[in-house]
């Protein structure tokens, strides 16, 4: 399997707030996490040279968009959007080469990338992170938002980082696709939302990869929508972008 630029240390932002999770790569990856990731094209990720996308966040009284270009193998990232102070910015960097005093770090642009990228390819990250997380199959459960049911797969990170014990519940269909997703905050003193419940809809395929481009639901009971636009992939050896459709 091709090697890809890992997002290290493992960092997850829920609606823009940083969460750190400790991971041990010595343990074995989860079979169910691998099964889900394969439904989204994990086995074909090596064919992909670059992915571009725009992350859109809609909250009451607040809309945010970030545009990204990402090379999974090299870790090269380009960003167009705003910095932490709301000023327009364009920047290109390789995350593994960043230092603590880098403007990209100080302006939290790399943090934004990790957040947005987790939402875009969350099944891949669950698989990559599974050696250091507890992944459990909980049987078929009723969906928290919509009608119907799905296999509940619970992912809990260890007691470490800024919000220890954070949990993600994936409700998975028979086709391996996530139907709905619930985030539970582990640390009640953390500033992130206590619970985020969203749909996984708007499925589109770009090349060999499958993306969920529309997530609607609530964050601590308030409406939230996270969506992706301008999603496309470029395959190795090609100059043509394949749009998600």
PLM regions and their residue ranges:
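Flexible, processing/modification-adjacent segments and terminal tails
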Residues: 25-35, 96-166, 188-192, 244-245
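N-terminal secretory signal peptides that target proteins for export/translocation
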Residues: 1-9
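Gly/Pro-enriched, hydrophobic low-complexity segments
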Residues: 147-244
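Bacterial N-terminal signal peptides
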Residues: 11-21
